[in-house]
């Protein structure tokens, strides 16, 4: 279904990945505290001397450019997220800080101190999400969900969230906004679904936590919203798809949040399946129908057709490291991240019905990163040695980090501009 365009090596383990909403740009947050932003080769069509049209990204002649790179956090960068218009990039780290930087340059414009936990210790972040130009959501290890009004000029001394909720007993593992209602005047979401521990919850911007599901007796780790499904009976044609730690996808009917209504076995294994770490909706023109890409803890990416509720294809991101980041850029290319690599994939030319057999990635590997700890293009003063990680929080959130990274060998190496 997908072929690899390129494999991009990183200087440390990937902890977070974010795709720009309007441009072919990907940002990564690393265990070392670095944040790096890349511009991917455009999928624009070029004509050669024979009049044949080819895409530079498909032929491998395009360049991946490093827009900027900096040591953003003293500790690991746990999570990243672009603003709704793509102008700002928000990062949060185990140093207890949220930083808002210009996406184009990496220059920090604002900092927010994360509230301490009840013991007075740093409450490490798990998720950051810009719900609208006005509202930033931040989840932490202590199960807190903080809401910040971005119109207020915060300082790291006086910053306080406008609201704080605890929708789950355990840390929040995923957050998926629900689309605005038909009567919305702003056009931005005001409700969102979260997973944490063994429950799913729905929270409203004004009314707080609305509902929490029954105990699912399985850890829920990822979620995504999908609409455009057939409507029949009580079905509204929209569902939230949730990935579990035991290899099972559960489908939740929108508005019926007490319990799941369908199950899809993605990875069956004796003693329990692989954790479904991250989910992404496949664009309709690529998926040949409603489809969800599932990043697994064993490094595979599987494609599940919703409706038929079965796995139809699979590719391999990495043989030893789990998939941490997964999404589709504005040009429809899949971007997967995990371990110390990011891979960019395009639709296979011979994909036909959208289903290929087991494909392995890494057809082209671009040149390695020189990984100098420079802050070029950034006026932030983040420097010095890394503080010790919050070992408990990182080990809990990144269950696959104990594995030894395995770098692929024997791959062709292609040079490109401005990697560092």
Curated annotation (Swiss-Prot):
GO cellular component: nucleolus
Sequence ranges of Basic residues compositional bias: 394-406
Sequence ranges of Acidic residues compositional bias: 368-387
Protein origin, superkingdom: Eukaryota
Region described as Disordered: spans on this chain: 39-63, 350-420
Keyword Repeat part of the UniProt annotation: yes
WD repeat copies, ranges: 9-48, 72-111, 117-158, 221-262, 271-314, 318-355
Cell compartment(s), UniProt: Nucleus, Nucleolus
Keywords of the record: Nucleus, Repeat, WD repeat
Family according to the record: Belongs to the WD repeat WDR55 family.
Record-linked PANTHER family: WD REPEAT-CONTAINING PROTEIN 55 (PTHR44019:SF20)
Protein name: WD repeat-containing protein jip5
């Amino acid at each position: 279904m997908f072929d690899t365009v390129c494999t991009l090596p990183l200087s440390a383990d990937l902890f977070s990945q974010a795709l720009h909403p309007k441009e072919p740009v990907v940002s990564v947050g690393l265990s070392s505290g670095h944040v790096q932003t890349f511009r991917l080769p455009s999928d624009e069509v070029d004509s050669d001397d024979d009049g044949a049209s080819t895409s530079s990204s498909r032929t491998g002649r395009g360049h991946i450019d490093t827009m900027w790179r900096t040591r953003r956090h003293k500790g690991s960068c746990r999570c990243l997220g672009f603003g709704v218009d793509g102008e700002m990039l928000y990062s949060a780290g185990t140093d207890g800080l949220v930083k808002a930087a210009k996406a184009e340059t990496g220059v920090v414009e604002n900092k927010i101190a994360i509230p301490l936990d009840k013991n007075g210790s740093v409450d490490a972040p798990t998720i950051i999400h810009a719900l609208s130009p006005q509202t930033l959501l931040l989840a932490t290890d202590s199960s807190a969900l903080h809401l910040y009004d971005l119109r207020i000029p915060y300082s790291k001394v006086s910053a306080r969230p406008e609201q704080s909720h605890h929708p789950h007993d355990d840390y929040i593992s995923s957050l998926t906004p629900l689309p605005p209602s038909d009567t919305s005047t702003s056009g931005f979401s005001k409700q969102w679904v979260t997973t944490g521990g063994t429950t799913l919850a729905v929270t409203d911007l004004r009314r707080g936590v609305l509902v929490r599901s029954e105990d699912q007796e399985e850890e829920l780790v990822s979620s995504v919203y999908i609409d455009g499904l057939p409507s029949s009976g009580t079905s509204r044609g929209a569902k939230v798809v949730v990935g579990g730690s035991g290899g099972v996808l559960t489908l939740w009917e929108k508005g019926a949040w007490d319990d799941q209504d369908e199950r899809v076995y993605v990875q069956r294994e004796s003693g329990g399946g692989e954790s479904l770490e991250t989910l992404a909706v496949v664009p309709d023109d690529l998926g040949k129908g409603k489809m969800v890409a599932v990043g697994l803890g064993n490094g595979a990416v599987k494609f599940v057709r919703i409706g038929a509720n079965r796995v139809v294809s699979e590719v391999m991101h990495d043989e030893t490291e789990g998939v941490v980041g997964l999404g589709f850029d504005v040009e429809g290319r899949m971007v997967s991240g995990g371990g110390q690599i990011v891979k960019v994939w395009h639709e296979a030319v011979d994909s036909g019905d959208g289903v290929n057999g087991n494909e392995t990635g890494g057809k082209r590997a671009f040149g390695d990163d020189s990984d100098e700890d420079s802050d070029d293009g950034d006026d932030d003063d983040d420097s010095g040695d890394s503080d010790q990680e919050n070992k408990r929080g990182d080990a809990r959130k990144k269950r696959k980090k104990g594995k030894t990274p395995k770098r692929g060998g024997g791959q062709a190496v292609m040079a490109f501009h401005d990697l560092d």
